[in-house]
């Protein structure tokens, strides 16, 4: 976000930061944007964007909707199926799983975007090395087990803390108590 803020300060782009769960504000801004970048759930507060509505919302012709899906991984959320143009993942986090990898991935079903992204990657040199690919594959092999375990543990912890007298708020979408929760 800092790079976007710097570019905006120089007048190179317009940058608006919106609460993920403010669907009306997103819909209003989407009609004039060239690039819409959503993170859902957000890190660290776990706010949930209404991706189904936003992916179907009216947008400027030719605009690109990107969803940062790092937190849920492709195992729990598939933004392309909801209508996003691009989904991105940080392979550094859940997918890698061992804190020894720096990387990311982009996915799209739009061949024109694939070609543009491939050209950018080639020109900028943003291609992973053999070790990074190995580490990503190693992490991907255990991803389902780790996500299932983390989800189970988080749900149990959130339920316990939600009933604790010294805890005023628990932000965990899986409990259904958040305003932005969608069962």
What does each model-identified segment do?
Residues 168-183:
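Conserved PLP-binding catalytic core of the aspartate aminotransferase-like
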Residues 1-163, 171:
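Conserved PLP-enzyme active-site core in the AAT-like
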């Amino acid at each position: 976000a800092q790079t976007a803020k710097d570019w905006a300060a120089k007048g190179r782009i317009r940058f608006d930061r919106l609460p993920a769960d403010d669907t009306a504000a997103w819909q209003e801004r989407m009609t004039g944007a060239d690039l819409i970048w959503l993170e859902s759930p957000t890190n660290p507060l776990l706010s949930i964007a209404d991706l189904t509505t936003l992916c179907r919302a009216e947008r400027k012709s030719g605009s690109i909707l990107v969803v940062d899906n790092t937190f849920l991984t492709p195992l729990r959320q598939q933004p392309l199926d909801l209508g996003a143009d691009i989904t991105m993942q940080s392979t550094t986090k859940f997918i890698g799983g061992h804190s020894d990898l720096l990387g990311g991935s982009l996915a799209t079903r739009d061949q024109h975007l694939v070609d543009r992204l491939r050209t950018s990657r080639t020109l900028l040199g943003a291609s992973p090395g053999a070790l990074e690919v190995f580490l990503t594959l190693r992490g991907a092999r255990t991803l389902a087990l780790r996500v299932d375990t983390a989800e189970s543990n988080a749900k149990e912890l959130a339920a316990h803390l939600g009933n604790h007298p010294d805890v005023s708020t628990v932000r965990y979408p899986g409990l259904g108590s958040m305003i932005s929760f969608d069962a």
